Amino acid sequence: MTSTSSTGTRPLSAEHEELRRTVEAFARDEVAPVIGDYYEKGAFPYDIVAKMGRMGLFGLPFPEEYGGMGGDYFALCLALEELARADSSVAITLEAGVSLGAMPIFRFGSQKQREEWLPRLCSGEALGAFGLTEPGGGSDAGATRTTARLEDGQWVIDGTKSFITNSGTDITA
């Protein structure tokens, strides 16, 4: 039997199916049984995120030269689907860390920035964060008012964010 994605339209390669099964087992066996405890305590699941890093999930779509897995976004989507079956917030931690944190550095950062940040972001040692939503502007990127300026060698950020995905952890970069 050929395995297909959840849409049932694209046959999975052997590599994609292996990844899907691995993440499915991880989500079922290691995330689902304990995630409720984190919610009750109001705690961030550092051990789950560390394991996701060791599994290479944060590095799925990035080249090996930066500590990535050399995979593709389809692999990331498969991993996100399986994680979300167990807990959507764990899936969002991965999604935001990769797509909103590390990918802009990979696509638009300097070589120095890639070398400095991507190995830590791909390993899960550090998490990329993203802040868009502002009071009065919601999540409309065109309505943001926060600014950043370089002053005496330091960045000064002036503004307020309502939500910052992946913020408030000891590993947020």
Residue ranges, per PLM feature:
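A structural signal for short hydrophobic beta-strand segments in well-ordered beta-sheet cores
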Residues: T146-R149
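A short, Trp-centered hydrophobic/proline-enriched beta-strand micro-motif
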Residues: G124-L132
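Intrinsic disorder at enzyme termini
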Residues: M1-E15
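A short core secondary-structure module
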Residues: Q154, D158-A173
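A non-catalytic, amphipathic alpha-helix used as a structural packing/dimerization or gating element
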Residues: E15-D29
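C-terminal helix-coil-helix/basic helical segment that borders enzyme active sites and/or dimer interfaces
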Residues: A32-A43
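Short, solvent-exposed loop/turn elements at beta->coil junctions and helix N-caps
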Residues: E65, T133-G137, S162-F163
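Internal helix-loop-helix
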Residues: R54-E125, T165-I171
